[in-house]
Amino acid sequence: MFKELLKKCLRGESLSAEEAEKIMNDIMNGKVPAAQIASVLTILTYRGETVDEIVGFVRGMKNNMNAISLEELNVVDTCGTGGDGASTFNISTASAIVASAAGVKVAKHGNRAVSSKSGSADVLEHLDIWIQGNEKEVKNAVADLNMSFLFAPLYHPAMKHVAATRKELGFRTVFNALGPLANPTNCTKQVIGVYSIELARKLAEALVVLGANHVLLVAGRDGLDEISATDVTDVVEVQGNVITEYTLAPEDVHLQRGKLEDLVVEDAKSSAELIESLFLNKSNVTAKNAVVLNSAAAIYVSGNVSTFEEGVAVALETIESGAAYTQLQRLKSKKVVEHAQ
């Protein structure tokens, strides 16, 4: 079956959602040789994935993940496709902490660095924040601390079947886009950083089919897969089955536009140091504004505020009042979660 679908791709034809789901199921179950996986990933990257293919691939990944039920907690995820090559500090991770300090329930999905200098798991280790290892720990952390970190390999063990091939290929594949759409909690409220507006549009259409509630897909024109504090950001907003596209600049919400170099770090350790100084109100303004903008997005999609600008005000207050730093200290304490068990 896989070979027939591969031949279909070679003929330049696209796959239906059902066919894409079948391909992903076979890949996730270790039924496909590495050479054939490489072939289909290369073909799809060259011609671009269709919305139906993305929908099917996401369903296939979800069929094979270790899911966690957090529907009653109404969680939000802040996750990016990664690979922007900008070597910035972990903006989405810092933003998740701020949003959780502001009362948003966050289930942050992430991994170690692949092409970047610091993955979300790497910086959390340097911040001494405990990474939960099972469903009970995750539920307790979200309920008691408003935040849990979902380390992707624990919930997507079947990805081991493509890890070596992805590394050998050395370029972005559909899996970069699929990761943020396959949160183990099946959350429907997200902020997803992507590397291009074209991809954002495709993912938005796929998210409508997959049942998203409220999602912001963001692509900074400076190349960041975040809401940019240094340039204009293209935004594709999904609310139910309604898709809206617009741009956002820092000055639109009364924030100063900064320089990209103010966001660059050497490694996970320096990323953690910048985040800690930011929460102590000692960082540069650009770093602070980057976190404010992305925190505001998470607060907005959570439904805790009605507009993005209201989210900015809440994020600013959360950082400047010291609430974000207090939350950081709470997240560092394993005893809070362990006691809840």
Swiss-Prot record:
Quaternary state and interactors: Homodimer.
Protein name: Anthranilate phosphoribosyltransferase
GO BP: L-tryptophan biosynthetic process
Enzyme Commission code(s) on record: 2.4.2.18
Taxonomy of the source species: Bacteria, Bacillati, Bacillota, Bacilli, Bacillales
Sequence positions that bind anthranilate 2: 166
Residues engaged in binding anthranilate 1: 80, 111
Catalytically driven reaction(s): N-(5-phospho-beta-D-ribosyl)anthranilate + diphosphate = 5-phospho-alpha-D-ribose 1-diphosphate + anthranilate
Pfam (any one): Glycos_transf_3
Annotated GO MF terms: anthranilate phosphoribosyltransferase activity; magnesium ion binding
Keywords: Amino-acid biosynthesis, Aromatic amino acid biosynthesis, Glycosyltransferase, Magnesium, Metal-binding, Transferase, Tryptophan biosynthesis
GO CC field: cytosol
Function: Catalyzes the transfer of the phosphoribosyl group of 5-phosphorylribose-1-pyrophosphate (PRPP) to anthranilate to yield N-(5'-phosphoribosyl)-anthranilate (PRA).
Cofactor(s) needed by this chain: Mg(2+)
Binding note for cofactor: Binds 2 magnesium ions per monomer.
Domain of life: Bacteria
Pathway entry: Amino-acid biosynthesis; L-tryptophan biosynthesis; L-tryptophan from chorismate: step 2/5
Binding site for 5-phospho-alpha-D-ribose 1-diphosphate: 80, 83-84, 88, 90-93, 108-116, 120
Source organism: Priestia megaterium (strain ATCC 12872 / QMB1551) (Bacillus megaterium)
Binding annotation for Mg(2+) 1: 92, 226
Gene3D superfamilies hit by this protein: Nucleoside phosphorylase/phosphoribosyltransferase catalytic domain, Transferase, Pyrimidine Nucleoside Phosphorylase, Chain C
Binding site for Mg(2+) 2: 225-226
The gene coding this protein: trpD
Family, per entry: Belongs to the anthranilate phosphoribosyltransferase family.
Primary enzyme class: transferase
